[in-house]
């Protein structure tokens, strides 16, 4: 099967982006990648949105020097098992746009970006944002590409939140959404915001949040990342090819250390706040004309699968066409991409029915 090579990270720019809070960002930048070609009728576009600390590098491999901020040279995209020529999201037929969320640290406007009004990083002054703000920014990108509709919005975890929010904010704009390892509302305590803020503030270089010129807080970020990867199921993923537990731990710690050099603590807080306030369960009526392929995994420790039947039942009662799939995966919160083969045929068939 052919692969995607030579992918370039691109940048969309807009001015004076107004947030729900009433505050405005003088400059809005969104990093993104595209795969495949837009049809003459401009009717074959799919939007892919990422999880909490992921990037917009969802598929293929970047051209030399053309990767987004913090993306390792030559690294495959995190949804590479699903996106590409002949794959479930078939780039021979679909034009795929993958975007880095507002507030993230992989090239889009976020706390580590320069505030044009001060010439310094926003840092702790970056305004609070909501999932609605994140999606509204993405809509500007989609509009700039001349897309009048989307076939689907696809995303895991926080990307699933975004897909649900897309359907609620812009009903009828997309034919379907494909949220995975996620829920239509943020479960109580998922954000663990106060604990995160306390951990970050405990770093000796915190300096009231102005750590950029104070040595940074990479050590604390490294510890947080290691804990997150373990909770997400990275140990189980590596176990298939790395039987030695010590070797797995060393590999995960190396991953965490590399990530900590490029990510930003304030981005973690900003996105956690958006995650904590997310809830579209009161907007189900807006999703009546949007098909939903909802994918969960029993091994996911972040989103309790016991809650899924009630979500599905409530959506169906609201008249939403929901297809519900449980993945027999032991990969935890990473199931939808680490075990992509388990549901690739289901996703491929679902998308073909939308064409």
Please identify what each model-predicted range represents.
Residues 267-284:
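Active-site nucleophile elbow and catalytic-triad environment of alpha/beta-hydrolase enzymes
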Residues 33-115:
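N-terminal cap/lid subdomain of alpha/beta-hydrolase-fold enzymes
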Residues 312, 316-355:
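Catalytic active-site module of serine/aspartate enzymes centered on a nucleophile-bearing elbow/loop
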Residues 301-310:
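Conserved alpha/beta-hydrolase "acid-adjacent" motif
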């Amino acid at each position: 099967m052919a692969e995607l090579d030579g992918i370039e990270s691109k940048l969309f720019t807009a001015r004076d982006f107004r947030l729900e809070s009433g505050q405005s960002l003088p400059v809005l930048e969104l990093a993104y990648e595209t795969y495949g070609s837009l049809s003459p009728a401009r009717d074959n576009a799919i939007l892919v949105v990422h999880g909490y600390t992921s990037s917009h590098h969802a598929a293929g491999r970047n051209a030399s020097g053309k990767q987004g901020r913090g993306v390792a040279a030559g690294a495959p995209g995190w949804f590479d098992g699903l996106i590409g020529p002949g794959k479930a999201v078939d780039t021979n037929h679909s034009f795929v746009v993958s975007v880095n969320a507002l507030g993230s640290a992989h090239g889009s406007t976020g706390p580590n970006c320069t505030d044009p009004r001060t010439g310094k990083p926003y840092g702790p002054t970056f305004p609070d944002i909501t999932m609605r703000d994140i999606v509204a920014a993405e809509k500007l990108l989609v509009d700039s590409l001349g897309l009048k509709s989307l076939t689907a919005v696809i995303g895991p975890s926080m990307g699933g939140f975004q897909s649900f929010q897309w359907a609620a904010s812009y009903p009828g704009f997309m034919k379907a959404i494909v949220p995975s390892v996620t829920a239509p509302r943020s479960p109580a305590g998922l954000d663990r915001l106060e604990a995160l803020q306390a951990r970050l503030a405990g770093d000796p270089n915190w300096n009231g949040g102005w750590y950029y010129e104070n040595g940074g807080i990479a050590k604390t970020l490294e510890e947080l990342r290691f804990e997150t990867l373990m909770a997400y199921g990275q140990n189980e993923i590596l176990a298939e090819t790395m039987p030695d537990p010590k070797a797995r731990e060393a590999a995960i710690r190396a991953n965490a250390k590399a990530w900590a050099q490029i990510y930003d603590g304030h981005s973690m807080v900003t996105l956690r706040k958006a995650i904590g306030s997310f809830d579209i369960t009161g907007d189900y009526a807006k999703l009546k004309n949007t098909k939903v392929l909802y994918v969960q995994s029993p091994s996911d420790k972040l989103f309790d699968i016991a809650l899924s039947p009630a979500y599905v039942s409530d959506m169906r009662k609201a008249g939403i066409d929901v297809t519900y799939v449980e993945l027999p995966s032991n990969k935890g919160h990473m199931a939808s991409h680490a075990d992509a083969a388990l549901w690739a045929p289901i996703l491929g068939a679902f998308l073909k029915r939308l064409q």
